[in-house]
Each structure stands twice: as C-alpha cells, then as structure tokens.
Amino acid sequence: MNDGYVKTDPWRLVEDRFDPSRTLSSESLFALGNGVMGGRANFEERYSGETLQGNYIGGVYYPDKTRVGWWKNGYPEYFAKVPNAAFWIGVDVAVDGEPLDLATVAEVKSFYRETDMRRSVLTRRMRVVLKNGVEVAVETVRFLSLARRELGVVKYAVTPLNRAARITFSPHVDADVRNADANYDEKFWEEVSTEADATQSRTKKSGFEAAWAQAVELDGAEWHCETRPEKVRATAAVSREKGCAAVLYKYAGICSSLNHAPADLIAAARAVAASGQEAGFEALLEEQTAAWAARWHGCDIEIGGDARAQQGIRFCIFMLLQTYTGVDTRLNIGPKGFTGEKYGGVTYWDTEAYCLPFYLATAGRAVARELLVYRYNQLDKAIENAAKLGFRDGAALYPMVTVNGEECHNEWEITFEEIHRNGAVAYAIFNYIRYTGDTAYLADCGLEVLLSVARFWAQRITWSGARQKYVMLGVTGPNEYENNVDNNWYTSYIACWSMRYAAESAAWVRENRPADYARICAKRRFDETAETKRWLEIADGMYFGEDRELGIFLQQDGYLDKEQTLAKDLDPADRPINQRWSWDRILRSCLIKQADVLQGLYFFGDDFDLDTVRRNFRFYEARTVHESSLSPCVHAILAARIGDLDKAYELYLRTVRLDLDDYNREVREGCHVTSMAGSWLSVVEGFGGMRVRDGVLSFDPQLPAAWESLSFKVNFRDRVLTVRITRNAVEVANEGAPVELEIRGVRRLIADKVIMNCEL
C-alpha cells in the first residue's frame, strides 16, 4: 500500500520525495488525459530506472493475435489493444555534458510532483546534483489541452545553482515504441514517414495512422535537427549564469486518421503545434484553466470534515473527466483509461453498469446517449458474435471485451460464460430512459438492442424436467472466483428482467411509434406476439435458488456446500488471494471477488424489501474479499441503504482511495478508472440516497459520522440541481424548469432559481 505516500490535499495529488520503487505507481496516479488521448506521468527526460512509458490515442487499436494454451472453438482470433503511441513528451537534458537522469545522478536533494486536478496540469520541481558536481533546479509543467484536443504542451526549465553552466536540451518524439503487454512481442506500429519536425506511423493489421509534430522555443538557441527512422530530435545548447534559468517550451501536435485523411496527417499535426506555439504557453494555460473550470462546474463534490474522503472523490471524478467527454461515439471508457496498458484499453460491461450513471448526472443526456449509441452501432457485430457460438435468429451476445464490437477476450470461462454482460447493456437502456425520460430512444435504437438480447436469453436457458423450471447452466457471474456454475442468481435474474423489459418496450414502441415499430419488425424480423409470449413464459418459469432458513438467495447451485470461510478470518499474508492462492483453491472456496447476488439487489432495489437486502448483505459481504475494484462501491451503497453507516463509510474509503492507497497492490499497472464511477455512486446514491422512482428524483440522505456536510450537483432532465446535506437539513437549489423532488418520502415542487430547505 502507499501508506500516505501521496499527500492529502483537496485539489492536488502530491508526492514530496523521490522513491524509485514507486515510480510505476506514480506514473499511473499522475497520468493526464483530455478525453481523446492521454498518457502516464513519465519523466520528460531520459530515465534509466524502472518505468512503463505510455501514451495512448483513443479509438486506435491493434488486433494482437490471441495467445492461449489450448484453442477452443469460438475463441476470438485476437485481442484488440490500444497501442502505446509515440513518446511525444521527450526532452533530454545535459548540463556541462552530463546527462540528467534521476536514476544515475549523484544526489536528489529535493523532489516534488503534483497534479492540479482543477485544471489537469502536471508540475514537477526538483534539485539534483549531477555526477560532474553541478547542482541544478528543474521545473517541468505539462498538460494535454482540453480546449485544443490534439495539442500537448511541455515547459521545461533548468537553473544552475552553484555555478554557471552550459545546458543542452534535446526535445524529441520517439515513435519506436512497443507494448509491454504484446502477446508475441510484436511492434504494433510501423513507420510511414519521418521529417525534420514530424513523424507518421501506421498500426499493423488495423491500418490506423497517426502523426506527431513538435514546435520548440528556447531563448538564444540555435537548433540542430536530427532525423532517424521513427525519431524526431532537435538539439540546442545555451549558457546560463548561476541562478539564471534556461526555459524550453514544447508544443506537440498529435493527429490520427480517425479525424484526418492519412495524407494530411503530418500537415495537420504541424498546424496544431504551430497554433499552440503562436498562442503561447501562458495563453494555453489560461484556456486549460477555463475549460476545466467548465468541466468541474457540473460535477464537483464537496465533503466537509474529511480531507481523505474529499481528495479521493475528486481524484475519481478527475480521472473520469480525463478519460471520456462524449465528443465521439467511437470512443468509450477503458478500465484503465489512459493510465496503463492492462485490459488493452477496451470496453467492458463496467461502462453500462457503473459509468453511465455518472455521465448521466454530470454531463447530461447527450453525452450519456453516446455511450448507448456506441453499443447500438455494434449490434450487428454482437449478433455475429452470438452466431459464432451457435445462437440464431438475430440473437445478440455483446462481447465481454471489445473496441470495434468483436469479442476480444480469450478465457473460455469469461468469453463464453460471463454472459450477464448482455443484461448490463439492456439495463443501461432502462437506466438512461428512467433518468432522462427520453423514451424516444427506444424507437430510435433501444428496442433493436433489447429484442436481440432477449432472443439470446431465450435460447441460452434449458428446461429442467427434474425441477420443472427453466435453468441457466454453465455460467460465470460477476464473482469471477466462481466459473462454470449452474443457476447463478444474478445472471438468471437479469436475464428474466431483460426479457420482460424487452416485451414491455416492444409494446410501447408499437403503441407510440407505429412507423418505427414497423421498421424494426421488418429489419429484425420480429414477431412480437410469438416472441414476447416465449420470453414471458421463461421469465415466469425460471428457477432461483434460495435458502429459506438463512433467508438468502443462493449465489449458485452448491454454494452452501463449500466450507464457509469468512473474509475477516483470512491470514493477511494470503491477501490478495488472487496473487497468493492457486486458481483451484480459489474456485473451491466460498470467497467472493465482487458483488454478485448483491449486484442484483443494487440494480433492482425496488423489487426487494430492506429486510431481504439486509439478510443477503450480511451473509455475502462477510465472504467478500473485494479484490475487484468494482466491489466496494456496490457494497457501500447497500450498506448505506440498510442503515449500516460505519460499514458504508469503511467501504466508501476503500473504493474512493483504492488507487491512491493501492489497496490491491496493482496501481503500477494503471488506475481503476471505470470503478471510479462507482465511487461517485457511493457518495450520491449511498450517502446522498439519490434514486429515481416513477420519474421522480428522490433523496434519502445519511451522513457518516466523519462528515460534517456533503454537497453535489446533478443534471436531472435538463435541470441542474445543487444538493447540500448537513446533519439536520437538506438544501436543494434548482437551475431550470420547475421539478418535482421527493425528500425522505415527501414530494415537493421546486421552481427555477429557488432554493428549498428541508429539515431532517
């Protein structure tokens, strides 16, 4: 764990010493992004110590050939990965001929690095003594422009402190890069062309192209340009007296074939770099500050009295804002965002289950709708994916892992069996419409997805003569510490719900949008009468395991046959168990990776009374090791709902500081960005008690003991609501048309520009 290594501050991430053993972790935590590209917090100058260079362009992928021990029919041929792109931030430095390299300097006298989360600016300040005895102060400032999404900016200042010195700068772009996670150690890029100030590359197989150009400034410099394959470098040396800084400015244009013709890429990148140079560093920084202020305006959360909780939630929101802006339907939210290579930068069910509610409430319906359209645009691929596994008649199975709609995951127990992801796609449509009231989406796109998903479920079930019930065999639920089980409760429940919702939606479209209904029936060969009858018959006849004595739903058949070990009784040396135990031992244990039954009780909370939720929570949370980043948030929300605020707060801190404190000892691989949306849910739905019932936004707030107050904003049906909660009252300010709200069970109408106070 990080043990306080990252200092607590409400708006900044700060490390105040240089620890080479934490370099990889800090590269993840201090990563930057602007929604279309991003990168790890690598040092600009050469660093010969342990590092994972990482710069990524959203939407660009490489089909890395699948690597498995035993090929099974139906496996995907490749895993689509976001390739590590050119190292555009590079600025090598030498002082009186001695290279600056933190791994080899004589002494690091001081080191300070911060990310200013208000404006997504990374600053580093250090004093070092080089091997030749020269002591220098170094300050770097870096950001990816939110206002100009193809521009990266670096300021690099070196000041000799104990004598005059000659300082050599070599700003460069290096496109000769590899992915650490390449299955066969292949390079994903090949050179197209390299010129004095720019280089262009193409991804092998997938054919995406990108270009990087740099424009540089340094007072008194005469530049010498060096061009080698895939590398652009400019070098200049300047003399500075003791105490006088040499300041380099670097403006990088980063353009891809997603937005430009390949033949125009170098010209486009040069134009971006030149326009940045013309604007100048200070003006660009002002633009950045203003653009980020606008982003924060609708989504900041303020927590009174708890600095660690405050920093944690802002860090989570910040990473989400850096990762996705909703400007492009081709983009989505990878589990690591732009912070690392793990999971390939691709889309999982995390987007629908966790991220959509955050963007719904903070960015508005248009941005959230883009996430749904992303899946709609990939529906035909989902139908192809299902057909490869033997399903027919337009049944769709959305991939577990994807960039372009094709399945990329190559573990059979996940690819073939973790089919609950289909339910998450359907639930996201329901959640979007419930929150926005945008029923038109059903006719525009949603019904086609819903009926295709329902067709899959109708074919995936089996009739059990012994039970006289429909059963769901051979699945993996959200708890991935169980594979190939029968009758996973969550999978069966969301399957039944999906079929019912598809039938309900078909009726709505038929009655309200008859022309669209006819179009959909023809396009998808949909026979509503026959198909919905079958769906409802299955939903009404599904088997669900339960233990009446314990009063719980059974996670799957045979779960109570396992030795009932509690998570609290594990030896700390065995944690996390996925890094300590054999997979055989994990599968035979009762220990749970993340919410499974409880995921269903969270999604469908209105279907169950609090006593049912409480019994299941007490039983399953005690057996949960929370070794998925997606786990603590769901448990925190449910704990708050049943009134266990101490447990809710404990789990909230775990989810919100999962990466800052490195609970699972893996932040070096990248941050858990999609689960950060769950951290937001923990605050707003957990302690804020926000839910939507019958089209009405309701709040049932409860503050943990450590908090004095909680404030947040939500965009609900084009009204921006500011909610402030204290021990004794709730205050809601409305910016927009009058809106009906429910607070602690009492409904009230709030007019525009009105602040309503309610005692608790």
Each language-model region and where it sits:
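Helix-terminus loop motifs that line ligand-binding clefts
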Residues: Y324-T339, R365-Y427, I433, A440-D444, ...
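Structured secondary-structure scaffolds
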Residues: R295-E370, R534-I538, G545, Q564, ...
